[in-house]
Amino acid sequence: MSQSSLPELRVSKAGDHVVELNQRLEHDGYLFFKRLLNPDRLLELRREMLTIMQEGGWLVTGTDPLDGIADPAARSTEGDLEYTDVYHKVYKLQAFHEIAHCSEVLDLLGRIRGCEMMPQPQKVARLWFPKYTDHTTPIHQDFVHFQGSFDTYTCWAPVGDCPTELGPLALVPGSHKVDKVLDHHFSLGAGSLAILEEDLGDQWLSNDFEAGDTLIFHSLTAHQALPNLSEDRMRVSLDNRYQAFGIPIAEQMLTPHLSNFADFDWEDVYANWESDELKYYWKQYDLEVSAKIETWGRIGFEEAMALTRDGDTNARHHLERMVKRDPEGEQSVSAAKLLGV
C-alpha cells in the first residue's frame, strides 16, 4: 500500500451529539479527533521523553531532543534488551502516565459509552527508529494482546506532529464487525502477530497527524503502523486503553509494559514521582481480573519455530532475541535447541 495516497480518516468533533458519536463508533470502529489533547502538554511530554532517549544514546548528541534526530547506530526495537533499558526509563515519567487520565479523553469516552471509563494501568509508548521497516507494527487486532473484553478502546496519539512518512496508524473501517478474533500469524514488529492482508478488505485509512490529534478505536478494529520512512526522525506515540469498570480486565494489563522482558515493577515506575494520587489507582476498584489467554502467543511461537526450520531469517532473528532475553524460559529453551546455541 502507498501510505501517501491512503484515503483520510473521517474527522469527528468532541462537541458532536453523543448519540451520533456512539453510532459512528459502532459502525466504523473508530473515531478521529483533531486537537483533542492539549498540544502544549504533549510537547512538554515529548521533551521529557526524548531527553531521556538522548541520554540513552538514541538521539544524535548536541541536537535538540524535540527534533527527535535518531542515531542509527543505536537502532533497536521491542524485544531487544537495549530497547527495554531505555524504554523503561521513559516509562517512569509521571507525566507519561498522567496524560492517560486527562479529562478530554475520559469524559468524552464516558459520554459516548454512557458509563464511567477507566484507563487501564498498563500504558504503552511506541518509540520507533527511522527506516527500521522490518519491525513496523503489523496488521492486528488489539484484543489478542490486551484481552479482557471486546468492549475496550485504544486511544492512539502521536507525541508531536506525525506526518504519514513518520508512520502513523492506518486502519480498516468497520473491520471490528466480524465480532471475533481473526487468525493471527507470526510476524516481526510489536506483538509479533499479524493478520494476513488478504483476510481483510482494502479500504485502509490514515492521516497526517498533528500534536493533539487522537484516534480512538475498538479492540477488534484491524490496524497497523505505517513504516517510519523519514530520513532520521524518531516516531513517538502513546497507546492508552480504556474500559468500563464492570467488564473483565486481563491480568497482564495490571503490570507495567514490557515487564515480562525485564525485572521491572510499579515500585520502579513510581520511585521518583512527586505525587501519590495515581499510584495503584485501580486497586480502589473491585475489578474482575481474567487470566491471560496464551493461545495466540503460542501459535506465533510455533509458526516462528517452523519457519526457522525452513530457513526464514526473520523468524530466526525473533527466536535469537527471545533466547537472549530469557534463556531459561520454556519457549527459549526449545528455541535454543533448534538454533543450536
Predicted feature descriptions by range:
Residues 2-28, 34-139, 145-146:
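Non-heme Fe(II)-dependent double-stranded beta-helix
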Residues 3-10, 59, 221-321, 333-337:
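Non-heme Fe(II)/2-oxoglutarate
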Residues 4, 11, 164-224:
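Double-stranded beta-helix
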Residues 37-39, 126-127, 144, 162-164, ...:
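Short, solvent-exposed loop/turn segments at secondary-structure junctions
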Residues 146-164, 216, 241-244:
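Short, conserved beta-strand element in jelly-roll/cupin
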